[in-house]
Amino acid sequence: MALPTPSDSTLPAEARGRGRRRRLVWTPSQSEALRACFERNPYPGIATRERLAQAIGIPEPRVQIWFQNERSRQLRQHRRESRPWPGRRGPPEGRRKRTAVTGSQTALLLRAFEKDRFPGIAAREELARETGLPESRIQIWFQNRRARHPGQGGRAPAQAGGLCSAAPGGGHPAPSWVAFAHTGAWGTGLPAPHVPCAPGALPQGAFVSQAARAAPALQPSQAAPAEGISQPAPARGDFAYAAPAPPDGALSHPQAPRWPPHPGKSREDRDPQRDGLPGPCAVAQPGPAQAGPQGQGVLAPPTSQGSPWWGWGRGPQVAGAAWEPQAGAAPPPQPAPPDASASARQGQMQGIPAPSQALQEPAPWSALPCGLLLDELLASPEFLQQAQPLLETEAPGELEASEEAASLEAPLSEEEYRALLEEL
């Protein structure tokens, strides 16, 4: 019995149309004899098929194939018409005896199978002469062999490849948690779809490769750059870029945008304390990382488990402390410039104090309340003074005239109020 094999449309290219048997053309008398026998028994035995083959002059294997094809056609037609398949009719007839294949015949067939899994009719007839087996039995043997051992016969299995199957230069592919950020008009970082790679492929500690420049976090240009990271001055002075490195090699969300400086103020009139203050949502963000030793843009996280929270350009901040402006307080001391011929960007950074060396020890991570920072900023006199023109609904001259007229009118007494009510 032959095992089920794939149809001709699913066979490999080397098995289709190469040395196949010629199609047998049936005469009308042969077709009538076959159909009459099929009506009596769709599953004829070997003796019935041999008598029918001798009567119509067709080899018995071709008669067997015809019955198989006719049963398939009838079964499909019954399924389309939702009719039950009658199946076998009458007592089962005798089957063909199992063909015994000796060891020498098996060795010849195996050698031929290793050379070609889909031999043509000429190769099968040659094997039939060498082994003494019928060609139809050799064809069935190859069908069964292909069904039992689909990976044998010199056919190499398909190699599966992926996006991260290989890395340039023999390095590890990027891990699955590496994502890039896209900045909009306000610099809001939007995580891009990450590349599906095997996690843990990169060594721990190096979390951003050369693509770290494409995923920066935003900071105002007035703030000093993070320690160990040199950033060029932007053209318009709106934002500068820095890439903080969180611990354990994990990427963090980019910081939220800061409050932009007032458009009416010049660069020199801006308050360095308020401009250097981190935004309302820039809390619990990792501090700046040290530059990688290779100089290829690889950033390493802090070596300790906990790191202090860094305000951009203001040094490490005390955990849990809120920023409170002090009225009348003297501005912080300005550090001396490192070079007399410094550029304009270094001159703008002189109003920002350098980070204290005593506070650079690692401290546990903490999150500052966003509401306190926002309330303090909204309640500051500078902010109220700047927002006063936006809150006024009348011209200043008209407002002063109405206030002066209201102050000249005396309030009504109780008797005058009652008299007014009676008149109404």
Curated annotation (Swiss-Prot):
Family annotation (Pfam families): Homeodomain
Effect annotated for changing R145E: Altered sequence specificity, with increased affinity for the DNA sequence 5'-TAATCTAATTA-3'
Distribution of this protein across tissues and organs: Isoform 1: Does not seem to be expressed in normal muscle, but is detected in muscle of individuals with FSHD, and also in testis (at protein level). Isoform 1: Does not seem to be expressed in normal muscle, but in muscle of individuals with FSHD, where it may be toxic to cells. Isoform 2: Detected in skeletal muscle, fibroblasts and testis from healthy individuals.
Region (Important for transcriptional activation of target genes): 405-424
GO MF terms, alphabetically ordered: DNA-binding transcription activator activity, RNA polymerase II-specific; DNA-binding transcription factor activity, RNA polymerase II-specific; RNA polymerase II cis-regulatory region sequence-specific DNA binding; RNA polymerase II transcription regulatory region sequence-specific DNA binding; sequence-specific double-stranded DNA binding; transcription cis-regulatory region binding
Biased segments, Basic and acidic residues type: 265-274
Effect caused by changing R96A: Decreased DNA binding affinity
Effect annotated for changing R23A: Mildly decreased DNA binding affinity
Phenotype when changing R20A: Decreased DNA binding affinity
Residue ranges with Low complexity bias: 278-302, 319-329
Record-level GO BP terms: apoptotic process; negative regulation of cell population proliferation; negative regulation of G0 to G1 transition; positive regulation of transcription by RNA polymerase II; regulation of transcription by RNA polymerase II
CDD domains: homeodomain (cd00086)
DNA-binding interval(s): 19-78, 94-153
Outcome of mutating R95A: No effect on DNA binding affinity
Subunit and partners: Binds DNA as a monomer. Interacts (via C-terminus) with EP300 and CREBBP.
Protein name per UniProt: Double homeobox protein 4
Organism from which the protein derives: Homo sapiens (Human)
Gene: DUX4
